[in-house]
């Protein structure tokens, strides 16, 4: 499911490639620079920051309006949270029930311990059909395992049919938002991408939204009508009936789920609901939280195989890929409640400034900051002696709590962030840490009256470094660690203790 907002990105320079790609990583859950480095790069792109602010504000406002229409919204959130808690508590039994239900209705269930197993299963199914192309419904699970790249190694092209995902794929880029994967692209870039990478794009294509959508529609229509295998993700799966559900906004999913002869669905094991009637709760929570709509334009549900109607071969791949490890963590398992609505991204002040690519994972934003490190686990040091880039993700937050306030299933993201931070700090004990070193220096100065007085005098001299607004903008190292990202207020020329001594009688009781 995606919403194409078409907000602009910065205009490329004349000597730049019109759509500079961000190549697909070898590890979709751990790639690129650590967050502090990537965030610094993103912060330098002021146009990107303005565009993200405009886009997230639009989605936030839409969500607020439709949520206000629901008098029992908080009760719905409680219900969604309770269902998800039940799923995690009974997950083994519910998965067995789902397998039984799907199998009884003509489907085939596969179990994948990790990305490699899942990719091998899907590649085996696809190559057995003798096809060299498949169509795909938008799926974060398949992005997580790098399925498109795995299929390419077997000579199979996976065509993304969601408009925004198609844009990202044609540009050899990475998505930067759950629902608006191409939020960092503007219309001019999209036109250039289509002309350069879409073989059947009209040569006179302009950047008018209607023309862009029409070109994509014609391109995809031919794929829908000729491709024999489709691959999808799943928003939900009802254990009692074996029914799988996909919600989307464009209709491409409906085409993929009905026209091809074979359908392969890759689903994280946490996407279960115990009963079909539980979908009532989530089909109210998800569209309002995600796209600010009262209901999804397209809600597709299918149960196994129906003779003469739709795909005649259905495979369900149940993906673990670190989820059972997260489930075993009492403090962090609530991250598996996530229904991928992206509401937390749209309210996060950090995401709004740096965008999705800075997180180095297909799961950006607040939920990505708690889910990605748990899925991948600590890796010690990466190649070249650098620390695992995911270790910094729990610190990519102001802990303002806005994500918790909007989460439709009440995931306490701030609390999990704090827990993951504590673990990272504990793992770092004994290493030279700038923050710890600064605290030791402060403790040394504050533990002795004479040293503290001397420190006050030194600090008072720095007021001369400030400008007319009494702010310091540049300091030498180690002060540059602060001033490279924010201004520093100058200390008062007179300390509080000196002011008190000058204005109060020492004999006067305080």
Language model features with spans:
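Ferredoxin-type iron-sulfur electron-transfer modules in oxidoreductases and energy-metabolism complexes
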Residues: 309-335, 345, 350-466, 471-472
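Short coil/turn segments at secondary-structure boundaries
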Residues: 164, 294-298, 432-437, 470-476
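The feature marks the mature, well-folded catalytic cores of soluble enzymes
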Residues: 2-331
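Short, contiguous, pocket-lining structural segments
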Residues: 271, 336-340
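A glycine-rich phosphate-binding loop feature that marks nucleotide/adenosyl-phosphate handling sites
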Residues: 117, 296-308, 340, 351-355, ...
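Intrinsic disorder at enzyme termini
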Residues: 11-59, 69, 352, 393, ...
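Intrinsically disordered, low-complexity coil segments
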Residues: 8-28, 200, 204, 377-389, ...
């Amino acid at each position: 499911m995606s919403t194409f907002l078409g907000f602009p990105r910065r205009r490329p320079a004349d000597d730049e490639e019109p759509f500079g790609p961000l190549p697909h990583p070898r590890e979709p859950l751990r790639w690129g620079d650590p967050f502090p480095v990537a965030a610094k790069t993103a912060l330098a792109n002021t146009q990107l920051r303005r565009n993200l602010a405009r886009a997230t504000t639009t989605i936030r406002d839409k969500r607020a309006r439709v949520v206000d229409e629901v008098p029992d919204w908080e009760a719905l959130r409680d219900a969604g949270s309770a269902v998800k808690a039940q799923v995690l508590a009974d997950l083994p039994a519910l998965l067995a029930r789902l397998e039984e239900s799907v199998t009884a209705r003509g489907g085939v269930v596969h179990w994948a311990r990790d990305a490699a197993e899942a990719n091998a299963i899907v590649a085996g199914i696809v190559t057995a059909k003798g096809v060299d192309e498949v169509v795909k419904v938008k799926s974060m699970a398949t992005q997580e395992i790098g399925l498109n790249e795995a299929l390419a190694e077997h000579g199979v092209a996976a065509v993304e049919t969601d408009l925004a995902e198609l844009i990202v794929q044609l540009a050899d880029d990475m998505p930067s938002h759950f629902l608006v994967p191409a939020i960092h692209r503007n219309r001019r870039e999209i036109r250039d991408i289509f002309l350069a990478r879409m073989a059947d794009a009209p040569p006179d294509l302009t950047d008018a939204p209607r023309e862009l959508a029409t070109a994509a529609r014609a391109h995809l229509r031919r794929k829908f009508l000729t491709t024999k295998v489709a691959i999808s993700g799943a928003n939900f799966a009802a254990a009692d009936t074996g029914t799988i559900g996909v919600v989307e906004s464009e209709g491409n999913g409906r085409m993929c789920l009905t026209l091809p002869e074979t359908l392969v669905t890759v689903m994280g094991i946490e996407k279960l609901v115990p009963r079909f009637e539980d979908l009532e709760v989530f089909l109210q929570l998800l569209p309002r939280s995600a796209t600010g709509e009262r209901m999804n334009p397209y809600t597709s549900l299918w149960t196994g195989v129906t003779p003469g109607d739709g795909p005649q071969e259905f495979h369900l791949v149940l993906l673990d890929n670190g989820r059972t490890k997260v489930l075993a963590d009492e403090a962090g398992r609530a991250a598996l409640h996530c229904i991928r609505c992206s509401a937390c991204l749209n309210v996060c002040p950090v995401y709004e400034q740096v965008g999705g690519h800075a997180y180095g994972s297909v799961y950006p934003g607040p939920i990505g900051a708690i889910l990605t490190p748990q899925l991948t686990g600590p890796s010690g040091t990466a190649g070249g002696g650098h620390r695992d880039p995911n270790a910094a993700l729990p610190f990519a937050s102001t802990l303002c709590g806005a994500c918790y306030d909007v989460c439709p299933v009440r995931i306490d993201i701030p609390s999990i962030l704090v827990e993951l931070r504590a673990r990272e700090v504990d793992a770092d004990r004994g290493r030279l840490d700038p923050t710890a070193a600064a605290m030791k220096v402060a403790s040394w100065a504050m533990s002795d009256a004479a040293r503290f007085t001397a420190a006050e005098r030194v600090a008072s001299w720095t007021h001369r470094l400030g400008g007319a607004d009494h702010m310091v903008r540049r300091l030498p190292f180690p002060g540059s660690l602060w001033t490279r990202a924010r201004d520093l207020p100058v200390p008062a020329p007179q300390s509080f203790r000196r002011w008190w001594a000058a204005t109060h009688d020492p004999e006067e009781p305080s």
